[in-house]
A protein has these predicted regions:
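An acidic-aromatic pocket/loop used at catalytic or ligand-binding sites
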Residues: 1-125, 139-148, 159-171
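Short glycine-rich, basic-tinged beta-strand/loop micro-motifs
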Residues: 125-135
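A glycine-rich helix N-cap at a beta->alpha junction
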Residues: 152-156
Length: 171
């Protein structure tokens, strides 16, 4: 995941363990491969949009079976036409923020409605989460999030350097 993201891939969906649902569903109905069946606690699924100029999605499903053998299923989905704007899920952003200790979003422009709504939804998943915002438009993003109902006490400016928007949990 981190290697693909370092190459510019955008993480759209990420689940682990029981959050992914039934491994039987993934193995048999989605991927059509019974060898991917195993304990739900030992599974992970990622969906990424590959970096431009590719208009492709990459799906990765990994599981460690009861016999301790690890399996990884990878599918690249190449689009026949340019893909529309695709945003990650709020749960994916929260999982990434917790795991990596920060979110670096390539949001170089002023706030837009779609991303503002997504970030508000992400913050609603954890009402105790406080964030530090940094980046060239961090102040504008903080204002946009506050206008959509996020309490000012949950958002703190940490600088205007750097491209995009960086979010870091505050303790």
């Amino acid at each position: 995941r981190q290697h693909l993201q370092a190459q510019g891939a955008q993480l759209l969906f990420w689940c682990e363990g029981r959050d992914c649902g039934s491994s039987s569903l993934w193995a048999n109905q989605i991927f059509g491969s019974a060898k991917l069946y195993g304990p739900e606690e030992q599974q992970s699924y990622l969906l990424l949009r590959l970096a431009e100029p590719q208009d492709s999605l990459l799906a990765l499903y990994g599981i460690v079976r009861g016999n301790r053998r690890a399996y990884l299923h990878v599918e690249q989905l190449d689009a026949g036409a340019p893909l529309p704007t695709l945003l990650p899920t709020a749960g994916t952003l929260l999982r990434q923020l917790r795991r990596d200790g920060q979110l670096q979003l390539a949001l170089v422009d002023a706030p837009n409605d779609d991303w503002s709504a997504l970030l508000v939804q992400t913050l609603r998943l954890d009402s105790t989460l406080r964030l530090g915002l940094s980046g060239i438009h961090a102040d504008a993003w903080r204002t946009a999030l506050q206008q959509q109902g996020v309490a000012a006490t949950r958002l703190q400016l940490q600088g205007s350097e750097g491209k995009g928007l960086t979010l870091q949990p505050l303790r």
